[in-house]
Regions:
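Catalytic-core "active-site belt" of small-molecule-metabolizing enzymes
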Residues: 1-153
Length: 153
């Protein structure tokens, strides 16, 4: 499975991180297969970072090959959705950004992409452009979002 992710895609989160620049194009990054953490397995904080952050994400499973797909046909190219957590070694990311280096080591480390069980878009509410999602840790809500708030859809 190839993971293609859009970084800096929520204005509110960008503001929390102190990003003031508004990107005209999406920031794309990828994660390798070894980043996938599923089936309820535990996440272990890597020893190479002192500052691992989490971001709750909506994950869409692509089911067909395609390229330059018109937005009105996009629904034909996915078949399931779930919630996920994108773990980031934020201390490394700051260092890499300052040096103009790629993010693979801070975003693509083993088990840095936790994903839930996929369900059909209909089971998730139908409209992927208006999905609510949240993250609870030990019974306390720590993040909440809606796909309508994405900068790039």
């Amino acid at each position: 499975m190839k993971i293609i992710a859009v970084g800096m895609n929520y204005a509110r989160h960008n503001k929390e991180l102190g990003h003031t620049q508004i990107n005209q194009e999406p920031v794309i990054f990828m994660k390798p297969d070894s980043a996938i953490l599923k089936d309820g397995k535990p996440f272990f904080v890597p020893d190479f970072s002192n500052e691992v952050h989490y971001e709750t994400e909506v994950v869409v499973r692509i089911c067909r090959l395609g390229k330059n797909i018109a937005p009105r046909f996009a629904h034909r190219y996915y078949d399931a959705v779930t919630v996920g957590i994108d773990f980031t070694a934020r201390d490394l990311q700051r260092k890499f950004r300052e040096a103009g280096n790629p993010w693979e080591l801070c975003k693509g480390f083993d088990n840095s992409a936790a994903i839930g069980t996929f369900i059909s878009p209909e089971q998730a509410g139908g409209d992927l452009q208006k999905l609510d999602f949240h993250l609870d840790i030990d019974g306390k809500e720590v993040q909440r979002g809606n796909t309508a708030d994405m900068l790039f859809r």
